[in-house]
Amino acid sequence: MAAPMNDVQRLEKSLLGHMGRAIADHRLIEDGDRIMVGVSGGKDSYTMLHLLRELQRRAPVKFELLAVNLDQGHPGFPADKLEAYFQREGYPYKLLKEDTYSIVLEKTPPGKTQCSVCSRMRRGILYTAAVELGCTKIALGHHRDDLIHTLLLNLFFAGSIKAMPPLLRSDDGRNVVIRPLCYAPEKDIAKFAELMAFPIIPCDLCGTQENLQRKRMQRLMEELGKEIPNVRQSVLNAMANVRPSHLLDKTLNPDPLHASEEGATTTEPKDTQGSASPWLESRQ
């Protein structure tokens, strides 16, 4: 009889299930991939790196991992803490350093969040580094709640129905971004990171600004969750259950007179928590 699982093992199994299904559903990882794993020092990226290595040991295909951290010149950024962690855990790694901190502060108006400018600059640096390092994919640690909050932000403030795709090719075609945690709940990631005692590095630029629109979306979902327990999973399911003929975008529905009534009523949402994929089975 197998020994009972402890909290870490239970969370790891659940998170591996979410990650394995996301990879299988969206073909995020292929045989021979060399994956740059963006590790910021936050709970999400640490968890992603840990889970990817666990999957690497049992995956139906072979792939490489390269942990990469970008030091953007934040005052007091403890790059040595990350390097010590990578060395202790035996991860192949590369540390990048680009002083974008001063540029971000210069280009951001007073009272505004630096997140958008910071993320654009960081993305450009990572894209270039991925090509130089021979990486075929860039893995980012966005989770289920990030996708939901992004969808709501675009809906409420940008007038568009757009979230974060699990897999995205860059405009120039040189890079492919994957989000293996896209099905994983943030609360499970946070608890797992706490139990694993990852050496978390807080973000001084964006993590402490309370009046961000994203924080408002987070609070909104928390309030809705009190009345609708499964609301987060329902919103995630909606992203995989789109009916273009029932929206107003004429590019998606050029012939409305012949639009199908299929999907006009509520249907059973796609289950992102279904049976285990081959990614969750041991490799022979």
UniProtKB/Swiss-Prot annotation:
Q: Which residues bind [4Fe-4S] cluster?
A: C115, C118, C206
The UniProt keywords, alphabetically, are: 4Fe-4S, ATP-binding, Cytoplasm, Iron, Iron-sulfur, Magnesium, Metal-binding, Nucleotide-binding, RNA-binding, Transferase, tRNA processing, tRNA-binding
Top EC category:
transferase
The record, for Pfam families, names: ATP_bind_3
Q: How is the cofactor bound?
A: Binds 1 [4Fe-4S] cluster per subunit. The cluster is chelated by three Cys residues, the fourth Fe has a free coordination site that may bind a sulfur atom transferred from the persulfide of IscS.
Q: Which GO terms describe its molecular function?
A: 4 iron, 4 sulfur cluster binding; ATP binding; metal ion binding; transferase activity; tRNA binding
Q: Where is the composition biased (Polar residues)?
A: 263-276
UniProt entry tagged with the keyword RNA-binding: yes
Pathway annotation from the record? tRNA modification
- The membrane spanning regions, by residue number, are none
Q: What's one GO BP annotation on this UniProt entry?
A: tRNA modification
Catalytic reaction equation(s)? cytidine(32) in tRNA + S-sulfanyl-L-cysteinyl-[cysteine desulfurase] + AH2 + ATP = 2-thiocytidine(32) in tRNA + L-cysteinyl-[cysteine desulfurase] + A + AMP + diphosphate + H(+)
What's its EC? 2.8.1.-
Query: What more does the entry say?
Result: The thiolation reaction likely consists of two steps: a first activation step by ATP to form an adenylated intermediate of the target base of tRNA, and a second nucleophilic substitution step of the sulfur (S) atom supplied by the hydrosulfide attached to the Fe-S cluster.
Q: What does this protein do?
A: Catalyzes the ATP-dependent 2-thiolation of cytidine in position 32 of tRNA, to form 2-thiocytidine (s(2)C32). The sulfur atoms are provided by the cysteine/cysteine desulfurase (IscS) system.
Instruction: Cite the record's note on assembly.
Output: Homodimer.
Descriptive protein name: tRNA-cytidine(32) 2-sulfurtransferase
Lineage summary:
Bacteria, Pseudomonadati, Myxococcota, Myxococcia, Myxococcales
